[in-house]
């Protein structure tokens, strides 16, 4: 259904161009931009479905590396901030970890996690001024990432299921937002493949907080250093 929606729109606007319905430069420009945007939607949907098929059958090639938490998230936030600014969405970022804190993670897939969570938040922002808060905390042997929005929130009855594939809270209301319905299930799988855990809290009309934890990297002392 979600793939068919942009295809139907592309066909409709293309037919409008061919039939001469778009009879002014402004209308033609609008139709062409809509076709382009819907084609991008299809591309994103296909990429998500392809990725999920790989993840679901454990065929995704993770490239784990030692990552400095502060440096990595600073780079991510800079990139995210530009995108949110273009959408007139406010961003606040707080990193409470030590400057030397490291994790073992796949940089590309962890970035996908962050982008998917924020992309999902953006879809459901309903306030005049959308806000995203990102906090990185030190919680014992783990780092905890919190991504908070001031969107419409999620009903308590729906909250336990938001990471299930193809699950949509109030699907009839949300159909206009688009998407594959598997973005958060991809996020959950990637975090679990990193040995972490993800969950959410939410209040309707106030907003949602997504949390995930990843174990910190700790040097294991070798036998020689112990004996010395």
Label each residue range with its predicted role.
Residues 37-42:
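Short alpha-helical segment of the dimerization/phosphotransfer core of two-component systems
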Residues 57-62, 102-105:
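Conserved micro-motifs of the catalytic ATP-binding
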Residues 63-81:
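A conserved beta-strand-to-alpha-helix junction within the catalytic ATP-binding
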Residues 63-66, 85, 90-101:
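Conserved catalytic submotifs in the C-terminal HATPase_c
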Residues 121-122:
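Short helix-loop "hinge" at the ATP-lid/N-box region of the Bergerat-fold HATPase_c
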Residues 154-168:
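Short conserved segment of the HATPase_c
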Residues 195-196:
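Conserved glycine-rich
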